[in-house]
Amino acid sequence: WGTSGAPGRTTLAVGIATALSAHASTLLVDADTANPTIAHLLGFPVHASGLSSLARTASRGPITPADTLGASVMRSKNLHVITGLVTPHRWREVSKPGIESIVGALRLSARYSVIDVASTCLEKASRGASRDDAALGVLERADRLVIVARGDIVGINRLSFLARWWREQERDIPVEVIVNRVSTAAIGPHPVPSLQAAIGAFMPDCIFHVVPEDEGVGRASLRGKALGENGARCDASDALQAIVEQWVPTL
């Protein structure tokens, strides 16, 4: 999850799942109903949606691990991917109860699950169906939340609004922030102290991590590779790998 704009939620979600798959079975799920892009990023066919398939299964009854794996695409021995909607205008295919059933099924299907969701409207939810339903359903059922923000003035400002909204939800789960695309050009000559001061003003107890601006990210995307996958190593992937290694003992 993360701020509006393009902070790099999908890129980091894919990289996190790839790093986790080195340790145990992992499912990567594209539940971004606004801009589903994992299939595009990894070079998968985009004419069928694993998420829609699972949502239809959920409407008929409980989802089994066999259903989950059957709706996924194998990326590597330990990494399976459930691709997102074929097109964003079909967001109604994934209801809030449906995504909650999917999240529950994921826990029985792999050791780790990484779910990429869209940024949400930071206003009170409407009574009817909403494009935010999938993201809200995931946020309500998640065991851990990773918030992605872009490392510039606009990104940190957006993070402050998101942090206030999240506090109002009163969810008691571990939350960490990844500040992505950090550079001295955008933050100043001392990025980490500057970020500590800025984020500490509205998230004083927050653990945050930094992933640097890196041209290697674009090169990996052009090749259909996840960060850190088969020759797609760069400074950004090394930073993300280090973050995941910190998490693994507590997952």
Predicted regions mapped to residue ranges:
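Phosphate-binding/switch loop-helix module in NTP-utilizing enzymes
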Residues: 78-128, 135
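Conserved C-terminal guanine-recognition region of P-loop GTPase G domains, centered on the G4
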Residues: 135-136, 159-172
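NTP-binding/hydrolysis catalytic cores, primarily Walker-type P-loop NTPases
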Residues: 222-251
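Phosphate-binding loop that captures ATP/GTP phosphates
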Residues: 20-81, 103, 208
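Beta-strand-loop-alpha "switch" segments that mediate conformational coupling across diverse proteins
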Residues: 181-183, 189-228
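Conserved Switch II/interswitch segment of TRAFAC-class P-loop GTPases
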Residues: 119-123, 142-160, 186-188
